[in-house]
Regions:
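Terminal catalytic/cofactor-binding subdomain
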Residues: 1-128, 137, 157, 167
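Internal, well-ordered domain-core segments that constitute the primary functional module
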Residues: 123-171
Length: 171
């Protein structure tokens, strides 16, 4: 039970953000072969819409917020904006990929010709060689959070202690 204002404040001050990945697909349910839509902005610099491994793997990023409803509303707004700008394509809803026709059918994300852009693209090409392109099309949702007043070392200590005592905490 939370009994003090400080305890309640520590929970209401939690900062959170979401990163949601979705594959763009065509009407046949296959991976979209089109480049990242220019209407969605530059994948390298857009604060809310980027690509992950593939040109067809969109990643939606919400800003950090202490409000759960604001975070979800932002994600919904990003989805609506995206659907309005991807023509006849759809977003694949599952984490396991849609119909794939081999590694060659999975276009690696192109971030342009700047040094940073080339580095991101080369990194992704390396992942494809090391693990296979199909593995890189598995998508998901990342839930990022931080407790108010804690630095990185304190967050890592919290995680280590949770893992150490998980057998007690999760039974």
């Amino acid at each position: 039970e939370l009994t003090t204002a400080a305890q309640v404040s520590s929970l209401t001050g939690i900062q959170r953000g979401l990163e949601k990945e979705s594959l763009r697909i065509n009407n046949a349910g296959k991976l979209a072969q089109t480049p990242h839509p220019t209407e969605l902005g530059a994948a390298l610099t857009h604060p809310y819409i980027t690509t992950d491994y593939s040109e067809a793997l969109l990643e939606f990023i919400t800003p950090v917020s202490t409000s759960i409803s604001a975070t979800l509303e932002t994600l919904e707004t990003i989805h609506r904006y995206t659907y309005a700008h991807i023509d006849d394509e759809l977003l694949w809803g599952a984490s396991m990929p849609c119909i794939l026709e081999g590694d060659a059918s999975i276009p690696v994300a192109d971030y342009g010709t700047s040094n940073v852009g080339r580095a991101k693209s080369v990194y992704r090409m390396g992942l494809g060689h090391r693990y296979g392109r199909r593995m890189q099309t598995i998508s998901g949702i990342h839930y990022n959070w931080s407790l108010p007043g804690l630095n990185n070392n304190e967050h890592f200590a919290l995680i280590r202690n949770f893992r150490r005592h998980a057998f007690l905490l999760l039974t």
